[in-house]
């Protein structure tokens, strides 16, 4: 019976990904952004559960999943649009923006490493966790290049984003950060795409700064992690 589901076609993996994503998006909006209903998180859990319950292999899913994965990198390029829209702000505060994001990203990388060695994780797990500061399209090839497990990296990136999506705006308000540039950079640096979504709810400037942060963090991760990995591992 399972064979009749078309599991050997790309449509299977695409539908297994998109159906829970669309449903979760509907309820996520209905519940005013309840973090456990974050579409990325729900579709990931639902996909794993479906494959586990049906006994369908990951290889069957991957046929269609790879097609979705192909569009991750072109989608990331879209973050250049807010960069262009806010180019005057970027020119005016470029040192503060680049400096703040660079410091935040390096601290995040070191904290990830300290947590990993505290819990005595193996080198492969540490390599999988180090790139999680970047968005998925950037983190996965970096993880693969330093000997990490891409699936584990993807999980780390998504969980990190879900937490920031749920708590990021509240933390910004808790610390009374009123500057829209600072708020956007904080959310984008810590939560990548979902951080930008949280920043969007605060304002247009926050959204643009969050998008800028995603791009810059990605560049830093690509440049720094491959250099740090041989030293730390």
Swiss-Prot record:
Matching InterPro entries: Antiholin-like_LrgB, CidB/LrgB
Localisation per UniProt entry: Cell membrane
GO biological process, one term: programmed cell death
Protein topology in the membrane: Multi-pass membrane protein
Keywords, comma-separated and alphabetical: Cell membrane, Cytolysis, Membrane, Transmembrane, Transmembrane helix
Record-linked Pfam families: LrgB
Family, as annotated: Belongs to the CidB/LrgB family. LrgB subfamily.
PANTHER family named among the record's database cross-references: PLASTIDAL GLYCOLATE_GLYCERATE TRANSLOCATOR 1, CHLOROPLASTIC, PUTATIVE SEROTONIN TRANSPORTER
Task performed by this protein: Inhibits the expression or activity of extracellular murein hydrolases by interacting, possibly with LrgA, with the holin-like proteins CidA and/or CidB. The LrgAB and CidAB proteins may affect the proton motive force of the membrane. May be involved in programmed cell death (PCD), possibly triggering PCD in response to antibiotics and environmental stresses.
Protein name per Swiss-Prot or TrEMBL: Antiholin-like protein LrgB
Underlying gene: lrgB
